[in-house]
Amino acid sequence: MTLRLSRRAYAEMFGPTTGDRVRLADTELLIEIERDYTIYGEEVKFGGGKVIRDGMGQSQRVAADVPDTIITNAVILDHWGIVKADIAIKHGRIAAIGKAGNPDIQPGVTIAIGAATEVIAGEGLIVTAGGIDTHIHFISPQQIDEALASGVTTMLGGGTGPATGTNATTCTPGPWHMERMLQAADGWPINLGFLGKGNASLPQPLVEQIAAGAIGLKLHEDWGTTPAAIDNCLSVADDTDTQVAIHTDTLNEAGFVESTVAAFKGRTIHTYHTEGAGGGHAPDILKVCGEANVLPSSTNPTRPYTINTLDEHLDMLMVCHHLDPSIAEDLAFAESRIRRETIAAEDILHDLGALSMLSSDSQAMGRVGEVIIRTWQTAHKMKVQRGALPEDGARNDNFRAKRYVAKYTINPAITHGIAHEVGSIEPGKWADLVLWEPAFFGIKPSMILKGGMIAVAQMGDPNASIPTPQPVHYREMFATRGGALARTSLTFVSQMAADAGIAERYGLAKRIVPVRNCRNVTKADMIHNAWRPSISVDPETYDVIADGQLLTCEPASVLPMAQRYFLF
């Protein structure tokens, strides 16, 4: 017997299907479902009188043959596509994306449900991969709570707490600090990796940090990012298959941007603050976007360009970099970094895929809980100001959505050698997943899974008779407690450190995962974000020209995903 449902009725029951469109929060961005893996009339749904019951949608298969958890009828938004599917999780990893059910009685089932299977209802929800923030100043451990609740599940950077050096630079300096921070990582339900200090002109001070567990090295101008330090740091990285992140020389003391690029010698490097105001060679650090070996990112304080962006930056900069406003030279240093023209160009360079990643710069001018919000605010602003991308039509913004989600998921993972574990929703990867109601997309997740287990969720009064009564707010769940914490999150280290047995020597509880393939990555590997324009910046007007075109846009006076979501 066939029952015909309207699209509205079907979407309300099972979530949107192929050809349906979903608005992301209150933005002008619309995504359209490209494919539905489920089968009409054979959908599985949990609940009283519904499908996932013994002998119906649930089979008799034993635990070894069924997933531990399925997310039913979810919309997946990832760099590879926008699809509707059931998601299977097994042993903390994504096991399959397809059609769940009982293969004994249903056709087309690729994921068998059994008595060992838990169900998370994904109908009407969007699922994304956990975010990856690659620009963390580990100033306060409480950042992790904020980041996790925003949908970020991996944090990479450096620091030792609110030390003056950490306030300004993302470095965990030396073996002793590296060991202590790796031990501290055991206490937090998030994936972590630490960068050592890369500013030295001889190899051994850097090699010993990699051997102690650093996933890479950070060159920062506040420690002296000279051509000699750059060359030495990249040589050590090549020898150890680790990544180098760099904050270049704002004052152009040791050379101009051309000197820095020359010191790279064509070697792969992640350029932090490839942007309009965050630091680095003033005023033309944006030039490096055109280099094949440069993997550029920018940070969220300038995302997107608004009428308030310039005003808040000066005071932030003075605090973060230990500057004194009564000293003329310090004030000039700060003012040289804040340029409306290059900030405006940064918006467009993100939209065209020249800037490959977006991160926070946590508590050091950036906001750790706003990476995802500001990514999508930038996408919205560019849609409004520049219209549809050539790859998109009038019906949807699918390519733009894939481009922007890649900036904080797969591209950071590729850059830092962790894409074999995290960064996308693909079988075999660690099940770090974020579930969103479309109306709250990018702003307030409904639930965050770490390693296949619920880590954080919106939860009501624990003394209530049901889960939903007020006050509803983010609460840590069972993945953050006891021994489950260490089994649902990862600590990333160098291969050298893993081979040296630091897990046993340091007494680490979390599983350690070596980074790999950091040195073979090029801009061409940055998914949907590989454009390499020839950029020039006028030294007097700061106008940015890319491939002969002036890049400029107006500041936004109103943004979506803002005040209406944060009344309480």
From Swiss-Prot:
Cofactor comment text: Binds 2 nickel ions per subunit.
Pfam families found in the cross-reference section: Amidohydro_1 (PF01979), Urease_alpha (PF00449)
Binding residues annotated for Ni(2+) 1, in chain numbering: H135, H137, K218, D361
Binding site for substrate: H220
Catalytic activity: urea + 2 H2O + H(+) = hydrogencarbonate + 2 NH4(+)
Residues where Ni(2+) 2 binds: K218, H247, H273
Highest rank taxon of the organism: Bacteria
Location, primary (coarse class): cytoplasm
Classification via NCBIfam families: PRK13206.1, PRK13207.1, urease_alph
Protein name: Urease subunit alpha
